[in-house]
From Swiss-Prot:
Catalyzes cyanide-resistant oxygen consumption. May increase respiration when the cytochrome respiratory pathway is restricted, or in response to low temperatures. Binds 2 iron ions per subunit. The lineage of its organism: Eukaryota, Fungi, Dikarya, Basidiomycota, Agaricomycotina. One of its GO terms (cellular component) is mitochondrial inner membrane. It comes from Cryptococcus neoformans var. grubii serotype A (strain H99 / ATCC 208821 / CBS 10515 / FGSC 9487) (Filobasidiella neoformans var. grubii). The gene is AOX1. Fe cation 2 binds at E230, E281, E335, H338. It is found in: Mitochondrion inner membrane. This is Alternative oxidase, mitochondrial.
């Protein structure tokens, strides 16, 4: 490489470090020849070494070596570790379909019928003290929530279901069934709270990334996706519900208390916070499974053949003929995903590991039938997805035949 000639040492130093192009045409070059300086390879190497000394603490070689000595991490540094670049993704003209309004700002889930049927009620047995504390807290909150909403996990006997007609009014009067309005009351309260953890975690990790002057490893985006997904659940059910003053007051009070409590929990122990959310989502899947069972058994006649709201058809890319039952099944699949992701994140090193789901989601079958990944499974999954992404990127750019 030919020597780089510039007007002054200061300009040369800043230009080399920035890696930017040389500015100026032939006239500028000729006028500078008599007063130029030539930098040898040794000088340029010294300039670059000086630059590392002035780097942020997290980028200095000694700090990076110390981090490596602590053991392996989930994920790795390098290209594509926090998700695909927009230029690496295959473009799709969603506006060609008149029934859609375009892509949503963040990831929005799309399921097949088979994938929706894979969702199961599963749970992770608590192991550590933190796990047990999170699990017991969720169980206590669940009991309080059931009492507030009048919910009873009652399974109607087959003999009662065989009656024509089914004594729905009698079952509701005995507190064994929820009416459509009580289901909406319960769901709206649940979803108004469920959108808090992702936003809290994303906010705190965003601030941590800026505070430490280092990248986050893909955690922020997944947590914000979770928060938006839960908010879309709330907006969907708001299209068929008209909350009164009492419901709005409860939402305001519950959200204010829960946000601050979860904020403090995440500051103290992100691991316990994610375990708490994983356990909370287990209960959400259980609740929606009960709701689906009641709808399929004809125990909520007000929702029979009710069409899916337009916002739900657009968000989940559902067929135009979809019903409210299809929407609730999609919501349950989302909750199973949050259960899977948060339990998996709780198993990671909260300060050093990369988010294994920054590159790609696990398969819907796994998300629906497993409580989550162990740390070893997360490391394997992250490596596999990074290799797939790199191979696809190289193939699309013509580097591989």
């Amino acid at each position: 490489m030919s020597a780089i000639m510039l007007r002054s040492g200061n300009v040369a130093r800043s230009t080399i470090l920035a890696g930017g192009p040389l500015i100026g045409g032939p006239m500028t070059f000729r006028s500078a020849v008599s007063s130029t300086r030539t930098f040898s390879l040794f000088t340029k190497a010294r300039i670059q070494s000086d630059d590392m000394k002035r780097a942020s603490l997290s980028l200095q070689p000694s700090v990076r070596e110390a981090e490596k000595s602590q053991g392996p991490v989930v994920g790795s540094e390098g290209r594509g570790v926090e998700g695909p670049h927009y230029q690496d993704q295959v473009s799709h003209n969603v506006l060609s379909d008149a029934s859609t309004t375009g892509a949503w700002t963040m990831f929005n889930p799309i399921y097949t019928e088979k994938e929706l049927n894979t969702v199961q009620v599963v749970g992770r047995a608590p192991v550590t003290f933190g796990d047990k504390a999170a699990h017991r807290t969720v169980k206590f909150l669940r009991k309080c929530f059931d009492l507030l909403t009048g919910y009873t996990p009652y399974e109607v006997p087959a003999s009662v279901l065989a009656q024509k007609p089914i004594p729905i009014a009698e079952l509701r009067s005995k507190g064994k069934l929820l009416s459509d309005q009580k289901w909406l009351f319960r769901i709206i309260l649940l979803e108004s709270i469920a959108g808090v953890p992702g936003m809290v975690g994303g906010t705190l990790r965003h601030l941590r990334s800026m505070r430490l002057l280092k990248r986050d490893g893909g955690w922020i985006h997944s947590l914000l996706e979770e928060a938006e997904n839960e908010r879309m659940h709330l907006l969907t059910f708001m299209t068929i519900a008209q909350p009164g003053i009492f419901t709005r007051a409860l939402v305001l009070a519950a959200q204010g208390v829960f946000y601050n409590a979860f904020f403090l929990t995440y500051l103290i122990s992100p691991r316990i916070a994610h375990r708490f959310v994983g356990a909370l989502e287990e209960e959400a899947v259980r609740t929606y499974t009960h709701c689906i069972s009641d709808m399929e058994a004809g125990l909520i006649p007000e929702w029979k053949d009710m069409p899916a709201p337009a916002i739900a058809i657009d968000y989940w890319r559902l067929p135009a003929s979809s019903s409210l039952l299809d929407v609730i099944r999609a919501v349950r699949a989302d909750e199973a995903t949050h259960r899977f992701v948060n339990h998996s994140l709780a198993n990671l090193d909260q300060k050093r590991d990369f988010n294994p789901f920054a590159l790609s989601e696990a398969s819907p079958e796994e998300r629906g039938s497993k409580w989550g990944y162990t740390r070893e499974e997360s490391a394997k999954f992250a490596l596999e997805q990074q290799r797939k992404l790199m191979a696809a990127s190289e193939k699309s750019s013509g580097l591989v035949e």
